[in-house]
């Protein structure tokens, strides 16, 4: 059973223009140390939500009528948390999170919820959920618990260069299309800010390939209107140390994306 | 924000695309052997590119774009017209490769050593690894890649931080040596225990060997600590001699470049092991103001105790270093005193300043430092 509740505290976004990002409530709220109170503790994805909010704020500062904004919805698939749906909504209000909708569904049909809500990016701490969402054509990424420990205020999105260079194959795998359109929208958002002091940073990382891959990725992204801020070419070097300096919030690849393998 | 108006067709045509077989293959399998052969022919050279080593196994040299290449004109645009104009200029001139900078001959020489090492030890990862570390924006990336291609450099790794400090990345890359035009960044790196030096473009560039890497070091405050220099600066030459004599058998403490000399020594031994001592493509030099008969002894004893061999030790006993360096023609010469660095540069030697120790308080610069 899938149900959606609107958050009346928050102004609803323009359905045609907004970039819908779904995050699981299990990622946003910490339910482990449960003292049974009204409000959950903050979880891994909490700083991410704040960063998304900051981008929206700055976009509206640039233009008060801006409609290309992040539209964040909280999706609850966890049975335990579902039973406490009011706690989720009250926690959201307590922290003043800019969540426009709450979706409740079971583990089995949460992908239906994603598709119904036109979700362009799904973020979760559960690998299985990432796989399943991808298989259903929804761009999704795994939130890394280690990296979340030193969050940045700036929204840092990592794009995998090894995936970008794939030539447009016909038919395009569903994940690829989602990644392309999301990165294009990200590029549009990025263009509204100057070089420095941007609330959003796009980081290109080529994990396996060398400078050719990186160059191709930069060119391809540029042709889509995506200006990259940082570019790191690893050419097979271990990614751990560099990722901990980069501190991306999530990684965009094509379909299944893992920050740490 | 810079608006791009590039025709995608223009951009995408003529690109060499690497053959990628991603783990989540989209089922586009090249079943027939002929098809694969054909594809490979389009990518001649890519299949013969050696795999870069793991950073922790290699001697990693991080160079900034401003010392690897000459970017004075672009720097001027940045200073006079701001970052947006600077990036626009870079993109406009994207297909124009930069000219070689002061670190260029050094990097070429590192690659020559790698070629020899690979011949002798094809499976080993004990090689030089070069990482381009720049706080440039990724907008400049394509021009840098075009330049690397143009000069046939073997650089597969880079780090364009888009304005944030590169220091954290230096550590993540297990950097053994960092070369930059920015004295502040170099000081930060030294403070983090990473060997680093600021490089300057000499007015005339003397020719250096393209078969043998030559690295020259000053002694005090470069290979060794600055303790003796402190004595000299505080109490004069006589006290310095006295102190060195009294402490002849006490090892000097290590300086910021000791580790790099050690790394070079390890690679040298690999050539010796294959009977190539006379033909070794790495040669190291100590060029010090100490005297052979007196203060130099302590330096030699220290090096010996550290198990470090230096190929040539030149004790100048205070004589100017310029002429000696002109004879040696090192690919890089490390000194803690700007006075010596500038003197060397005037004679065409590629000199790098190590901003470490007491000498920094007594800078007698002829020109303003670190651009």
Positions of predicted regions on the chain:
Chain A
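HAD-like aspartate-dependent phosphatase fold
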Residues: 1-261
């Amino acid at each position: 059973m899938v149900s959606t509740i609107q958050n009346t505290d928050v102004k609803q976004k323009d359905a045609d223009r907004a970039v819908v990002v779904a995050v699981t409530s299990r990622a946003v709220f910490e339910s482990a140390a449960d003292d049974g109170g009204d409000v959950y503790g903050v979880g891994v994805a909490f700083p991410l939500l704040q960063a998304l909010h900051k981008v929206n704020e700055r976009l509206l500062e640039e233009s008060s009528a801006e409609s290309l904004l992040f539209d964040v919805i909280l999706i609850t698939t966890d049975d335990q948390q579902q039973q406490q749906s009011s706690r989720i909504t009250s926690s959201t209000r307590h922290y003043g999170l800019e969540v426009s909708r709450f979706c409740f569904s079971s583990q089995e049909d949460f992908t239906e919820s994603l598709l119904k809500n036109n979700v362009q990016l799904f973020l979760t701490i559960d690998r299985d959920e990432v796989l399943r969402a991808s298989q259903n054509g929804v761009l999704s990424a795994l939130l890394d618990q280690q990296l979340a420990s030193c969050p940045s205020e700036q929204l840092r999105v990592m794009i995998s260069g090894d995936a970008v260079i794939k030539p447009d194959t016909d038919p395009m795998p569903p994940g690829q299309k989602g990644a392309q359109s999301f990165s294009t929208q990200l590029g549009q958002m990025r263009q509204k800010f100057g070089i420095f002091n941007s609330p959003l940073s796009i980081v290109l990382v080529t994990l396996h390939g060398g400078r050719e891959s990186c160059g191709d990725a930069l060119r391809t992204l540029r042709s889509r209107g995506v200006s990259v801020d940082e570019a790191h070419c690893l050419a097979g070097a271990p990614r751990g140390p560099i990722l901990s300096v980069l501190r991306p919030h999530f990684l965009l690849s094509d379909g299944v994306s893992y920050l740490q393998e | 924000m810079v608006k791009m108006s590039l025709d995608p067709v223009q951009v995408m045509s003529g690109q060499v695309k690497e053959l990628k077989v991603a783990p989540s293959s989209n089922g586009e399998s090249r079943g027939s052997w002929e098809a694969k052969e054909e594809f490979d022919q389009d990518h001649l050279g890519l299949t013969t590119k050696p795999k870069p080593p793991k950073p922790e196994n290699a001697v990693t040299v991080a160079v900034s774009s401003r010392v690897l290449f000459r970017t004075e004109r672009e720097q001027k645009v940045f200073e006079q017209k701001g970052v947006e104009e600077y990036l626009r200029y870079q993109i406009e001139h994207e297909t124009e490769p930069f000219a070689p900078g002061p670190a260029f001959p050094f990097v070429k020489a590192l690659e020559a050593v790698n070629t020899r090492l690979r011949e002798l030890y094809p499976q080993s990862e004990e090689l030089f690894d070069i990482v381009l570390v720049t706080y440039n924006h990724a907008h400049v990336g394509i021009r840098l890649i075009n330049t690397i291609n143009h000069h046939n450099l073997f650089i597969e790794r880079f780090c364009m931080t888009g304005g944030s400090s590169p220091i954290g990345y230096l550590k993540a890359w297990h950097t053994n040596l960092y070369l930059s035009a920015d004295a502040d960044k170099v000081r930060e790196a030294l403070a983090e225990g990473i060997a680093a030096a600021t490089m300057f473009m000499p007015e005339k560039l003397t020719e250096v060997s393209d078969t043998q890497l030559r690295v020259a070091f000053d002694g005090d405050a470069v290979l060794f600590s600055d303790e003796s220099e402190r004595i000299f600066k505080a109490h004069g030459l006589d006290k310095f001699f006295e102190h060195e004599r009294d402490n002849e058998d006490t090892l000097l403490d290590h300086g910021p470049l000791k580790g790099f000399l050690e790394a070079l020594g390890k690679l040298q031994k690999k050539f010796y092991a294959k009977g190539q001592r006379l033909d070794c493509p790495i040669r190291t030099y100590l060029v010090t103001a100490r005297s052979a008969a007196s203060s130099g002894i302590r330096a030699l004893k220290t090096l010996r105790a550290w198990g470090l061999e230096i190929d040539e030790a030149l004790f100048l006993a205070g004589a100017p270093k310029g002429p000696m360096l002109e004879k040696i023609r090192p690919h890089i010469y490390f000194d803690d005193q700007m006075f010596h660095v500038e003197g060397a540069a005037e004679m065409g030697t590629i000199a790098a300043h190590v901003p470490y120790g007491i000498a920094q308080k007594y800078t007698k610069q002829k020109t303003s430092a670190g651009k």
